[in-house]
UniProtKB/Swiss-Prot annotation:
Zn(2+) 2 binds at residues 443, 446, 461, 466. This is Gex-3-interacting protein 13. The gene is gei-13. Residues 47-57 have a biased composition (Basic and acidic residues). Residues 18-97, 171-195 are annotated as: Disordered. It comes from Caenorhabditis elegans.
Amino acid sequence: MTDCSSTLAALLPTADFTASLGNSDDHVDVSSFTTTSESTSPPYSSSEHHSPTDQRTETPTSDSGNASFSPENVATSFESSDRDASPDNLSTSSAHLNDLQEKGVVVDEELQRQLLRFHQDFKESLMENNQNTINMMSAAFNQQLFKQTLANLNTVTPQLPVNIPTGLPMPASPCTTAASAPSVESTPTKRKRQRRNPVWPYFDVIDGTARCKQCLYSTKSVFSTNLKVHLRSHHRPDYEKVIMAEDALNLNALLLSGNTSKLFNVDANRKRMPPMTSSILMTINKLANQQQNGEENPLNAVLRQTIANNGLQQHLQNVQTQLQAAQAAVQKQQQQQQQQQIQQQQQQQQQGAIPQFALNAANLAALNQLARNQMQPTPPPVPQVSQDNIINTLNFPAHIKQEIMNAPHGTDANGVPQPKRRRLRRHPVWVYFKDLEDRMVGCTNCEFRTGSAFSTNLKMHLKAHHKDDYEKVLQLEEEMRLEEGCFGPGNKFKTELIDYIRGGGNVTTPPTPNSSSFPSTPKTPQLVQQIISQSFARSQSPNVIQNGEIKIKKECEDDMFSGLSSTDKLAALVGIAGQEVKKEEAMPANFEEFRQRLLANSSLSSFLGQSTAQPIAVDLNGSVIASETKSPCSSNEDDRKQERDKALARLWADNETLLTNTHFREFVHCLAPEYEIPDVDILATSLVDQY
């Protein structure tokens, strides 16, 4: 390209150009021709145009061609221009200026400079923006001249600028706009990522989405690790193939790198070992197993060649030697630990065998008793009452006996599984009851059901509805008590007395025959009759003397029924007024008199923890009544038991075989049924505390 004059001469004929300038109206916007602004610069004058992408930053002004052409606007455009008004900016070609002068074009000097500057800006904008060029040409020339200008542009091939740093030519078309899409040559090419992982053959990557070739799985996270996770979860055989291929590649790379010593160096630092070592060893084991089974794997050839070239056989021998040494050290350590554990156990057993206690009288007595028990022969085993014996003894119906015998362990008679109960059902009352669903218990003789599965409640049911079965249960209880060593009956007197009072029995009333609608009158026991008769006789006389030993006042006898309610007192005294008082014999009439006589003895009273000076009486409820207080004794049960233990300890100190005497145990049980004879250790401790 030449200067601006040559450009005008090449684009327009001289006559047309002069006529267009002379015939232009006052409304032509000259500012639309000038594109000089603070944001505009020559395409080759700054470093902003060194890259091809910088040419897309220019945008056409939205207000071009809108302002009117006037001298004020021309002057304003001259003043606002950032170019120097000196003649240095003018073209040095004087030939074209002479041509203009020869053709008689008379213009002002300032207007001439404006025209030259316009042509220079036109040349620059022609290379930068096609849209601005079209706007300027459409505003400056008529349609005829615009067509001619386009024809001249087609014939002239402009010289393309060259980007100096890159050496790439600028875009060939000067008509590219900012809105148009950039060309392929102008955008830098993105380096394609290498996909060397063997997982990629199982996936297709389309538009940044990886799709599995075997199922409908797709993901935008196009990474080999995620794809391997999919194969591991849904295509296990392919996943194993990928892992084996990865291991082969890693092993080959590791061996070719010359770092084979790190592969089998057990003592080396783990951080320096490659992360795929464990996986490689697993692959080697798999390949070895395949070779033993007669299967040939294509990776075996690679391994054999690598081992032959790099001499891994020696490394394997070293590894085996190190492993054997490590195993020997581990076995030796395990043997030492076992020996230490055995020694500790022996020491603990020896310490547990030696009793650690002080040498005092209580401990010596306990040791003596322990030695005697070991020297005495063991008593013969007492036969236990089994369920079969009870069932055979009692007369059950055939169907009930069959259900009881056929019921498996953990189920009821109906075969329903039952949860394991904590309580042992050794009481004979359970022969008449069976387990039902929902932890219920049912009677085998009727439709009675209850959730309170306790032997006492079940006995009350038998007592109220099945008298014969209740008597059998009481008989079996007595037999079991004797066989288990619980000598003597229970509190039979109190039980019979309570049953008699609640039943409303009368001493003089004979028992009536049973009827279907009314229950029978309970039979009066002989012991209860004697107690009632003696109580009536004492109430008639103010003082009753028995063998001159114990004096019981009338006031004390009046309080014997203080523990009973009014209804129970009336029930107990029914028919007593017509009873004749029997003459007392030399022998005691009942057990209570015998007990009171025994209490008079000083040694026995001290044994029972009671004083001899204070008279003692017992009411119908079994409560001890003192004559002075006329109320039940308020002594603490624990204190009484301690006093009894001390007295028994003194007797045991005089005769050490006292506790093993069966008659002495029966005697103590008769005196105090509620008192339990303590062990030898407790008696020895009580004896030491006394002294």
